[in-house]
């Protein structure tokens, strides 16, 4: 009965949730490295302390099983979960921002396989796809509060807009696990993700700026605004580019569309003649960017992608000057593991920071796999799961 009354209150709160999707705006940060320069003002998402902490984690040693990075933790801070302990088997519910790109599709297959691997411990797994729409996800969470879930996993579509919905779930008495993208509240039992956007953005931007000729022209390609992990990737890249005095001639949103990406790159080639570097806040359309240079008869400049196999193959075949910071899809296993530990009353880390490996020229060969589809991600952490490799093909 307590959960039912709390859920009713939560529904009322959800009805008051704002309708706007997050939009990044410039804002003061109080930090010298956040000041505007050639790349404009820093994003409202930039937090100097978080930036410093993530860069420090790049050199940290994780705790946990050496062969299971999805169970490892960087600098763990354990929290008590005894109040959520209950007997199983359990009903675990998942409110998913979207399945609208290969990264999320590979990740969700990995999560489904983890559910299967847990066998009799999970009685029912409920997945709701918000289709990249804030208001649908708010309604989805509202609906799940009345479905008898034992734990709720949320990958929020955007940060600020989904925060009240997550807070409502917490107030309903559910143990909430947030992963991948964050929210502006501390109420979830744990927030799971790899090192994060600052680390990703920094690694790619440092490499590209160091490999470019001094004062060269750089094109930054972003997916969409308002998502914390993407905003912080750009925030960290901006710091690196400003420090290196890189001439950032454009910052464009691709919507994750290969055709739009190729058109943007071609437009900049036509406008400037030469582009000396390309930085991307995600690698899903990296091959499209490479192809735009090839189609124009231009050398491919230093570029960062991600661990998507099509990019790794092009990198190897064309001998690109490249790097692949990653946001590993193995993180999709961790929320299931965390939810079960919480329901067992075991302590978990909050935040639960996972390792975030980088693919370089030196280790590229170990991640290539010609037997898997081009849109598969090398960091899936899925080779020991039921249905591998067929489930991911």
What kind of feature is each model-predicted range?
Residues 13-18:
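C-terminal motif of bacterial Sec signal peptides marking the signal peptidase cleavage site
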Residues 1-11:
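N-terminal export and membrane-targeting signals
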Residues 19-393:
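A residue-level marker of the well-folded mature domains of exported/periplasmic proteins
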């Amino acid at each position: 009965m307590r959960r039912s009354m709390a859920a009713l209150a939560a529904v009322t709160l959800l009805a008051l949730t704002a309708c706007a999707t997050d939009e990044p705006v410039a804002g003061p940060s109080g930090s010298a490295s956040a000041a505007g320069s050639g790349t404009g003002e820093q994003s409202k998402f930039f937090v100097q302390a978080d930036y410093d902490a993530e860069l420090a984690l790049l050199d940290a040693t994780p705790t946990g099983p050496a062969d299971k990075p999805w169970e490892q933790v960087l600098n763990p801070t354990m929290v008590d979960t005894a109040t959520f302990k209950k007997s199983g088997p359990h009903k675990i519910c998942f409110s998913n921002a979207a399945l609208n790109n290969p990264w999320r599709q590979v990740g969700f297959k990995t999560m489904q396989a983890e559910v299967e691997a847990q066998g009799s411990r999970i009685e029912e797994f409920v997945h709701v796809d918000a289709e990249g729409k804030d208001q649908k996800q708010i309604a989805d969470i509202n609906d799940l509060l009345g479905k008898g879930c034992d734990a709720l996993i949320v990958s929020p579509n955007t940060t600020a807009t989904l925060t009240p919905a997550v807070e409502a779930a917490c107030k309903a008495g559910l143990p909430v696990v947030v992963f991948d993208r964050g929210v502006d509240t501390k109420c979830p039992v744990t927030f799971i993700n790899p090192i994060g956007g600052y680390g990703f953005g920094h690694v790619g931007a440092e490499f590209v700026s160091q490999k470019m000729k001094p004062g060269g022209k750089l094109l930054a390609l972003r997916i969409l605004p308002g998502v914390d992990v993407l905003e912080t990737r750009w925030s960290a890249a901006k710091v690196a580019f400003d420090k290196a005095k890189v001439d950032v001639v454009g910052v464009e949103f691709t919507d994750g569309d290969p055709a739009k990406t190729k058109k943007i790159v071609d437009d900049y080639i036509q406008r400037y003649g030469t582009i000396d570097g390309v930085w991307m806040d995600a690698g899903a359309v990296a091959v499209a960017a490479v192809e735009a240079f090839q189609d124009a008869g231009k050398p491919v400049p230093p570029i960062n992608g991600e661990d998507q196999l099509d990019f790794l193959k092009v990198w190897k075949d064309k001998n690109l000057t490249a790097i692949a910071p990653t946001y590993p899809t193995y993180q999709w296993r961790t929320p299931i593991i965390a939810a079960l530990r919480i329901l067992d009353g075991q302590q978990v880390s909050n935040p639960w920071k996972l390792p975030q490996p980088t693919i370089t020229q030196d280790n590229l060969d170990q991640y290539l796999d010609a037997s898997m589809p081009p849109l598969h991600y090398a960091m899936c952490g899925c080779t020991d799961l039921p249905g591998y490799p067929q489930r991911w093909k």
